[in-house]
């Protein structure tokens, strides 16, 4: 069974080797047919502490690393600085 992969934005990098990633999803309400946005935060393992808040990353599910971490950062794009 393939591992799930999600795309999100790094919200926090204050913990060692961990980033908090906000993943947004959109769906249509079954009755009102209005598009709704929901978001969820995931704690993901970042071995080299290379991602900062605002970076777009892809996370992949993995075996439990700690109490909250079940995702690993696979790849990411650093935020453009002007």
UniProtKB/Swiss-Prot annotation:
Keywords: Ribonucleoprotein, Ribosomal protein, RNA-binding, rRNA-binding. Gene3D superfamilies: Nucleic acid-binding proteins. One of its GO terms (cellular component) is cytosolic small ribosomal subunit. GO terms for molecular function: rRNA binding; structural constituent of ribosome. It comes from the Bacteria. The keyword Membrane does not apply. InterPro entries: NA-bd_OB-fold (IPR012340), Ribosomal_uS17 (IPR000266), Ribosomal_uS17_bact/chlr (IPR019984), Ribosomal_uS17_CS (IPR019979). GO terms for biological process: translation. Transmembrane segments: none annotated. Belongs to the universal ribosomal protein uS17 family. Part of the 30S ribosomal subunit. One of the primary rRNA binding proteins, it binds specifically to the 5'-end of 16S ribosomal RNA. PANTHER family: 40S RIBOSOMAL PROTEIN S11 FAMILY MEMBER, SMALL RIBOSOMAL SUBUNIT PROTEIN US17M. HAMAP family: Ribosomal_uS17_B. This is Small ribosomal subunit protein uS17. The gene is rpsQ.
């Amino acid at each position: 069974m393939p591992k799930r992969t999600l795309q999100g934005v790094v919200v926090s990098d204050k913990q060692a080797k961990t980033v908090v990633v906000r993943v947004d999803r959109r769906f249509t309400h079954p009755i009102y047919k209005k598009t709704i946005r929901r978001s969820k935060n995931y704690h993901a393992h970042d071995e080299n502490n290379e991602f900062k808040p605002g970076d777009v990353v892809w996370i992949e599910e993995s075996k439990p690393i700690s109490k909250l971490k079940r995702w690993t950062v696979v790849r990411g794009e650093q935020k453009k600085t002007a």
